Amino acid sequence: MQRFISGRIEYHTRGESTGRERFEMFARADGGRTLRALCEMRDVDLTRDVSMNLDTRSRPLDAFVRLVQRGRVRGSTLFTVHPHELVCEGKLADHGHVHQRHVLDAPLDYLGLHPLVGDALVTLVRGCDRPGETHCVAGYTNSSSPDGNEGLLAVRSNIAVTFIGHERR
């Protein structure tokens, strides 16, 4: 992998620009990576700031997310992943101080914090074997709403992912 990758994703709804996401991913000396994303969604007046550390297999080690909506901080949470536990600690406008502990039966493969570039990490868990076959990827997310602006707590998730095939050039 390159040492540093950056880019921008434009959000569109019905042909109109509704926001953007700027992201950076850089390799660390230990073989892991750090992913940062700043998401601005004008249609719902939401800004999401995400930073996530990944191990050598792109599994989450820790992550931080802050949401600002309509000029007001909705919440900030820190997710810390241990071999058999996920800890979520934060301060939320709707819930005050929160502290959650979730027992993990296996290492956590996926933590969905809603930047599109982070959502793409689910494809690494799914892999490229058996085109056309759907695999269910278990993980956690911080919100089950499409915009990622509700809840902001650690919630179990299961994502159905199908590898269609390799891109043709």
What are these regions (language model features)?
Residues 1-20, 30, 79-167:
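Solvent-exposed helix/loop surface patches that form functional interfaces
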Residues 26-28, 53-57, 164:
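Short beta-strand micro-motifs enriched in acidic
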Residues 35-37, 74, 143:
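Non-transmembrane, interaction-prone segments in cytosolic or luminal domains
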Residues 43-95:
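Hydrophobic/aromatic-rich structural module bridging two neighboring secondary-structure elements via a short loop
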